[in-house]
Amino acid sequence: MTTDDLAFDQRHIWHPYTSMTSPLPVYPVVSAEGCELILSDGRRLVDGMSSWWAAIHGYNHPQLNAAMKSQIDAMSHVMFGGITHAPAIELCRKLVAMTPQPLECVFLADSGSVAVEVAMKMALQYWQAKGEARQRFLTFRNGYHGDTFGAMSVCDPDNSMHSLWKGYLPENLFAPAPQSRMDGEWDERDMVGFARLMAAHRHEIAAVIIEPIVQGAGGMRMYHPEWLKRIRKICDREGILLIADEIATGFGRTGKLFACEHAEIAPDILCLGKALTGGTMTLSATLTTREVAETISNGEAGCFMHGPTFMGNPLACAAANASLAILESGDWQQQVADIEVQLREQLAPARDAEMVADVRVLGAIGVVETTHPVNMAALQKFFVEQGVWIRPFGKLIYLMPPYIILPQQLQRLTAAVNRAVQDETFFCQ
């Protein structure tokens, strides 16, 4: 990769959440293997991000590569309208078998945000088919559900990266963010705000949509499982649908295959993505119950009104099948448990740093919340110099490594975080 390539990149290519007039530096990756990203100058960085929660098996995994190479020789893509194929059938069979009952109807889509859009459309069309004008969603403050318009409408309008769009989006209902922590005691008072909104708007609400146990990009907050039990009970009592957005938490990240399992509940609609293909291809899935699917199908339209061009892409489905086969081997449970123990031990010293507000760990997620926002460019440069890839944002320095990470690799990540929080120059004050 030449200097001209990098200059073109900075001049013409938009990166996620980056300015075109003052772009953040980018680091040229030429290959990746295991838990390492290899830069064009030969430096190897231990990946602490799993490419945003996705590459749970690491990079260049032989099983994933073999599945995709085999599939591409047969067909890389074919439309899903009026056509089906073995990779999609196998994938949906696996998903129905592994997700909480009674989820049994699967809609395949392109990305996590689209999976959320699909879930919201399902909820709205469900109530339309029942002849009820329910058009609002109830969710938490500090939540994040994606970057498309519907998904943005259920992200916190005041405390998220989408606050710019407040006033342009449908006005949904936002309960106070959960305060009862995953590692703490349940506080009954936590439910008051949620219960009040439900009581006041029960006849308007199409669905409750939440990120189970872990609020992701909205703050990396980990809350008590009792919340899920209470919400499930309230939704059942009121006849309101429950959507679980497990785009980030699904497939083992929290120590359970799905975060809903921490409370032993099942949603009416479940959104999956990110790790679905082991981080190799873009693919998502939205699952729902037979009752929801048949109600929609028996409505005025006679079908669910959605159909992406690349729905059920065979190449992505083949990758997903291989990824799920790796998970089915069972090794991930011990891997995630070992990562959790190491993260708890090795991030504990960060609690004593003046710039640190909180440290929290669950499964293969380690979060250091700081008292001041990070200086992204300076801190990113420091991490690269330390031989690690960590992408902080706001007041969060967090780790979500591939499950296959070696103890010595994880130690490099935690050591870099501990060194970073001791240096006040990495923070905006």
Curated annotation (Swiss-Prot):
Keywords annotated in UniProt: Aminotransferase, Biotin biosynthesis, Cytoplasm, Pyridoxal phosphate, S-adenosyl-L-methionine, Transferase
Effect in UniProt of substituting D147N: Loss of aminotransferase activity
Null allele phenotype: Loss of biotin synthesis.
Chief location: cytoplasm
Subcellular location field: Cytoplasm
Positions contributing to pyridoxal 5'-phosphate binding: G112, S113, D245, P308, T309
Cofactor(s) demanded: pyridoxal 5'-phosphate
Residue positions where N6-(pyridoxal phosphate)lysine is found in the record: K274
Regulation of this protein's activity per its record: Inhibited by amiclenomycin. S-adenosyl-L-(2-hydroxy-4-methylthio)butyric acid and adenosine are competitive inhibitors with SAM and uncompetitive inhibitors with KAPA as substrates. S-adenosyl-L-ethionine, adenine and 8-keto-7-aminopelargonic acid are non-competitive inhibitors with both substrates.
One BP term from GO: biotin biosynthetic process
Consequence the record notes for mutating Y144F: Severely reduces the aminotransferase activity
Any GO MF annotation of the entry: adenosylmethionine-8-amino-7-oxononanoate transaminase activity
Annotated binding of substrate, by residue: W52, Y144, K274, G307, R391
CDD domains listed in its UniProt record: OAT_like (cd00610)
Induction of its expression: Repressed by BirA.
Pathway: Cofactor biosynthesis; biotin biosynthesis; 7,8-diaminononanoate from 8-amino-7-oxononanoate (SAM route): step 1/1
Keyword Transmembrane part of the UniProt annotation: no
Enzyme class: transferase
EC code(s) of this entry: 2.6.1.62
Consequence when changing R253M: Loss of aminotransferase activity
Site entry (Participates in the substrate recognition with KAPA and in a stacking interaction with the adenine ring of SAM), positions: Y17
Family according to the record: Belongs to the class-III pyridoxal-phosphate-dependent aminotransferase family. BioA subfamily.
Assembly mode: Homodimer.
Note: Catalysis proceeds by a classical ping-pong bi-bi reaction mechanism.
Protein name in UniProt: Adenosylmethionine-8-amino-7-oxononanoate aminotransferase
Taxonomic source organism: Escherichia coli (strain K12)
